[in-house]
Amino acid sequence: MFDEQAIKQSVQNMLLAIGEDPEREGLKETPRRVAQMYAELFSGMNQDPAEVLRVGYELGHREMVIIKDIPFYSMCEHHLLPFSGVVHIGYIPNIDGRVVGISKLARVVEIYAKRPQIQERMATQIADAIIDGLKCDGVAVVIEAEHMCMVMRGIKKPGSRVITSALRGSFHKSPAARAEFLSLIQQKH
């Protein structure tokens, strides 16, 4: 449930708390703008990735499928500052060879990115949604991102990137599958 009025009131209160006049010309519409922005940034809250993965095709394909460099942005739940980067996903279809359209994997990323988030959990959620939705033999997810909470505040280290992974099934059990995936996502175009 998205409460636009509560967000507008909270933004107005925050502006007052930092000593600003929320009625001055440049800030009059800020509470409304922020509420609209949050509606977009957190639109994944009420979406179910299982719905996205429901439609698939049993093609008999049993080899690794990879989509890499899926761009995303999300909001860190600790400071409500953005983090952004790319997600790499690989999966190995099950015995039926069930695959999904590649845009479906990007949509799963979007659903989880558009929530208050931490990168580690996002990798886990994406991997779990894909292995549960596709019933595939294995899933690998790698996320590389730059966090504004490390750039704008605190330690102030621009350019540093956080890399997280989540491995399920055959990618967790098989060093060869894991190595092939990691090798393929590192290849340049």
UniProtKB/Swiss-Prot annotation:
The keyword RNA-binding does not apply. GO terms for molecular function: GTP binding; GTP cyclohydrolase I activity; zinc ion binding. Keywords: GTP-binding, Hydrolase, Metal-binding, Nucleotide-binding, One-carbon metabolism, Zinc. InterPro entries: GTP-CH-I_C/QueF, GTP-CH-I_N, GTP_CycHdrlase_I, GTP_CycHdrlase_I_CS, GTP_CycHdrlase_I_dom. Pathway: Cofactor biosynthesis; 7,8-dihydroneopterin triphosphate biosynthesis; 7,8-dihydroneopterin triphosphate from GTP: step 1/1. GO terms for cellular component: cytoplasm. It is an enzyme of class 3 (hydrolase). Zn(2+) binds at residues 76, 79, 149. It catalyses: GTP + H2O = 7,8-dihydroneopterin 3'-triphosphate + formate + H(+). Belongs to the GTP cyclohydrolase I family. Toroid-shaped homodecamer, composed of two pentamers of five dimers. This is GTP cyclohydrolase 1. The gene is folE.
